[in-house]
Amino acid sequence: MTLRLLFLALNFFSVQVTENKILVKQSPLLVVDSNEVSLSCRYSYNLLAKEFRASLYKGVNSDVEVCVGNGNFTYQPQFRSNAEFNCDGDFDNETVTFRLWNLHVNHTDIYFCKIEFMYPPPYLDNERSNGTIIHIKEKHLCHTQSSPKLFWALVVVAGVLFCYGLLVTVALCVIWTNSRRNRLLQSDYMNMTPRRPGLTRKPYQPYAPARDFAAYRP
């Protein structure tokens, strides 16, 4: 009789422990190409039956509370986030979905869902799951977009400088050609300029004394 009572007691406690355990299912890995992600936590319990508190934790030891929301079957939960994160959420009978945005590479980590049933008693929470590794990929799009812009900017600057240098060279050549032509014309004008009129020098004639014709008169 005593053994039978002991067996019934152990069976009762095992049923109670099993009933008080809430299992949670999470995706093992989420790879994020953008800066947003939705993480769904499915529980083996009807969430609408009680007032609950749903939380999302970051880290192997669940050190950082990322997002938390309180709700029940009469009103939607109000989610609030850690200062480092931006989050919102939604729920149905067995699922709580956390939405995170403005994520960066340093947010890559393992995340755990937790559910706590606050009222009516008894207090219940879920068994620790294996968690979800959220991997945020580093963006290279900005670099690939900025490189062509930088390239074309350099091309435009080089083109402007080339055109400016070409114009300056042409202008200097024209100025040099005109200057050289003017010097040649001035030299020709100087050679063709007539001399100023003056006294002309008479040709030299040898001296011959004038004859006195009166002396020969009779």
Swiss-Prot record:
One of its GO terms (molecular function) is protein kinase binding. The gene is Cd28. The modification Phosphoserine is found at residue 187. Disulfide bonds join 41-113, 67-87. Residues 29-138 form the Ig-like V-type domain. Pfam families: V-set. Its main location: membrane. It is a single-pass type I membrane protein. The keyword Aminoacyl-tRNA synthetase does not apply. Phosphorylated by LCK. Dephosphorylated by PTPN11. It comes from the Eukaryota. The chain crosses the membrane at residues 151-177. Glycans are attached at residues 72, 93, 106, 130. Residues 1-19 form the signal peptide. This is T-cell-specific surface glycoprotein CD28. Residues 178-218 are cytoplasmic. SUPFAM superfamilies: Immunoglobulin. One of its GO terms (cellular component) is immunological synapse. Residues 20-150 are extracellular. InterPro entries: CD28, CTLA4/CD28, Ig-like_dom_sf, Ig-like_fold, Ig_V-set. Disruption phenotype: Cd28-deletion mice have some defects in germinal center reactions and antibody class switch recombination, but in principle are still able to mount cytotoxic T-cell responses to certain viruses. However, T-lymphocytes show impaired responses to lectins with a lack of interleukin-2 (IL-2) production. The modification Phosphotyrosine is found at residues 189, 207. It is found in: Cell membrane.
